[in-house]
Design a protein with these regions (language model features):
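Beta1-alpha1 glycine-rich phosphate/pyrophosphate-binding loop at the start
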Residues: 13-67, 153, 162-187
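N-terminal glycine-rich dinucleotide-binding loop that anchors FAD/FMN and/or NAD(P) in oxidoreductases
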Residues: 33, 37, 43-45, 52-79, ...
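Glycine-rich dinucleotide-binding loop and its adjacent helix/turn
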Residues: 123-168
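Extreme N-terminal leader/targeting segments of oxidoreductases
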Residues: 1-13, 70, 79
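FAD-site-proximal beta/loop scaffold in flavoenzymes
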Residues: 3, 132-148, 241-291, 299
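A conserved FAD-binding loop/helix module that cradles the flavin
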Residues: 27-29, 164-168, 280-322
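A Rossmann-like FAD-binding core segment of flavoenzymes
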Residues: 70-103, 109-111, 174-262, 309-322
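Residue-level detector of alpha-helix initiation sites
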Residues: 21-22, 122, 161-162, 284-285
Length: 322
């Protein structure tokens, strides 16, 4: 692919996987081992890039995400899968029910089937220091990072409908938890939520958060707009997820609205409402951690392989009858 000219047709593949994260590489591994001619289009922007380590994946607990993906690329290339660094900017379904995928380079590749694993982007609150510390001591997932920061002084920044749930959940890893309401008024919280927060021993602090306090390249506190500072060494925040559904929307895939964005309607294998198109990982749903994404990519690829097998057999039968 690296030698193709801009604007040219760069080949036909049995499957094109758009997205080179965990779900995409897992799908590509299955397809490569099934001897399917497969291309992975990898934009190189995995969701967990800010994190130094990933956790909760059996035998890979604590592995740096970049190292994990590099090993994944090495494995899939060993089965003849091609990987091109770039972005898929458009896709069109042709009259035969197959797909022409246009890359940012201007090249077009043809895919008999398509797996979309473009994931989502995390939109962080616009509080000074949050984006800069994200993945370090500003965290979003206690299952991913809670053990490493256990028993520290936790803060939770109210930013999404998940924030109260998050404040209750992180108490599993620390007895010192403060929920900063930020732009949420205390009377906006449900009575049941307030009772649960009190039962869990979570302190609730009203007032807008102005900035994070950092000293020696470590989070040391949370400063409110009124100037008061609360000592905290870890801040949990639930980013607003922004699904990358552009390609699926161009194909006319049916979407479902959730409190965390719009995602494609999929069956248990990841098949969307568009025949021949699967979605996996965070392209298919909000709460897909690395291990779930790998599983989703595997299921989509195995189903795609079987669907191609029977499509080719049925076509051979029709040709034989003619």
């Amino acid at each position: 692919m690296t030698g193709t000219k801009t604007g040219t047709s760069a080949g036909t593949y049995e499957a094109v996987v758009v997205g080179g994260g965990t779900a995409g590489l897992s799908a590509a591994l299955v397809l490569g081992r099934a001897r399917r001619r497969t291309l992975v289009v990898d934009e190189g922007a995995p969701r967990n890039a800010p994190a130094a380590h990933m956790q909760g994946y059996l035998t890979r607990d604590g592995m740096p995400p970049a190292e994990f993906l590099a090993e994944g690329r090495r494995e899939v290339e060993g089965y003849g899968v091609e990987i091109v660094r770039g972005r898929a900017v458009d896709v069109v379904r042709d009259g035969a029910g197959e797909f022409d995928v246009t890359l940012g380079s201007g090249d077009t590749v043809h895919a008999r089937r398509l797996i979309v694993t473009t994931g989502l982007a995390d939109e962080l609150p616009s509080v000074p220091g949050v984006a800069e510390r994200f993945g370090r001591d500003v965290l979003h997932c206690p299952y991913c990072h809670g053990w490493e920061v256990r028993d520290e002084a936790f803060g939770v920044l109210a930013a999404t409908p998940m924030s109260v749930h998050q404040a209750l959940m992180v108490g599993q890893w620390s007895n010192d938890v403060t929920l900063f309401l930020h732009t949420v008024a205390e009377d906006e919280l449900a009575d049941e939520d307030l009772r649960r927060l009190a039962a869990a021993g979570v302190a609730v602090v009203p007032g807008e958060v102005a900035e994070l306090v950092v000293a020696g390249d470590r989070l040391t506190g949370v400063r409110l707009a009124d100037g008061t500072t609360h000592d905290r060494s870890v801040l949990f925040v639930a980013p607003r997820p922004v699904p990358r559904t552009g390609l699926l929307e161009r194909l006319g895939a049916e979407l479902r609205e959730t409190p965390f964005g719009s995602y494609p309607v999929v069956d248990p294998t990841g098949l969307t409402s568009v025949p021949g198109v699967w979605a996996a990982g965070n392209a298919a749903g909000f709460a897909e951690q690395v291990v779930n994404a790998a599983s989703g990519g595997y299921r989509a690829a195995a189903t795609l392989n079987g669907e191609l097998l029977f499509a080719d057999l049925d076509a051979a039968i029709v040709r034989g009858q003619g």
